[in-house]
A protein has these predicted regions:
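Short, small-residue-enriched loops and turns at beta-alpha junctions
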Residues: 12-15, 43-49, 96-98, 104-106, ...
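Conserved N-terminal beta1-alpha1 strand-loop-helix module at the mouth
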Residues: 1-85, 144
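Histidine/lysine/aspartate-rich catalytic loop segments that bind and position anionic ligands
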Residues: 129-153
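Active-site beta->alpha loop and helix N-cap motifs at the rims of alpha/beta catalytic domains
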Residues: 70-108
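N-terminal small/glycine-rich loop or linker at the start of catalytic domains
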Residues: 1-16, 94, 98-101, 115, ...
Length: 153
């Protein structure tokens, strides 16, 4: 069994306090010492918790593979291409939600943007997943669209 840790809420707490406490790089060190297998980081469009500097600092200092959760937008595709994480998970985002409230509706995503993301993820050997509701229809859609894996809501 493998263990992945989502580090986003360390940043949420840090941001609420208005200082660098808790420190993300110290949290990363704890994760590395615990020998976790994957570090999940969700860079939201509104930068609510993790910001760009956090993302690149974590990548630079991490011995753990990064799983980048992101919306399927041009901006996020550019950032992912620059970051070159081991994994990318496409997630839905609504500005007014506190946390992700459901899976991605794969019937409504931009096929043009997905094609662009699939092309560079295959070229760079990045495993691509979709965060979907646990329905046979969505799981089959993910497979048919070319995703490597699914994450279930």
């Amino acid at each position: 069994m493998k263990l992945g840790i989502n580090i986003d809420h360390i940043a949420t707490l840090r941001n609420a306090r208005g200082q660098n406490n808790p420190n993300l790089l110290r949290a990363l060190k704890v994760c590395q010492d615990a020998k976790i297998d994957t570090l999940t980081v969700h860079l939201r469009e509104d930068r609510r918790h993790i910001n760009d500097k956090d993302l690149f600092d974590l990548k630079k200092n991490s011995k753990i593979p990064i799983n980048l959760e992101m919306a399927l937008t041009e901006e996020m595709i550019k950032i992912a291409n620059k970051l070159n994480p081991k994994f990318i998970c496409i997630v839905p985002e609504k500005r007014n939600e506190i946390t992700t409230e459901g899976g991605l509706n794969l019937n409504k995503i931009s096929k043009v943007k997905l094609k662009k993301l699939l092309k560079f993820s295959k070229k760079k050997n990045i495993q691509l997943s979709a965060f979907v509701n646990p329905t046979k229809r969505m799981i089959n859609s993910a497979k048919n669209l070319g995703f490597d894996t699914v994450e279930l809501h």
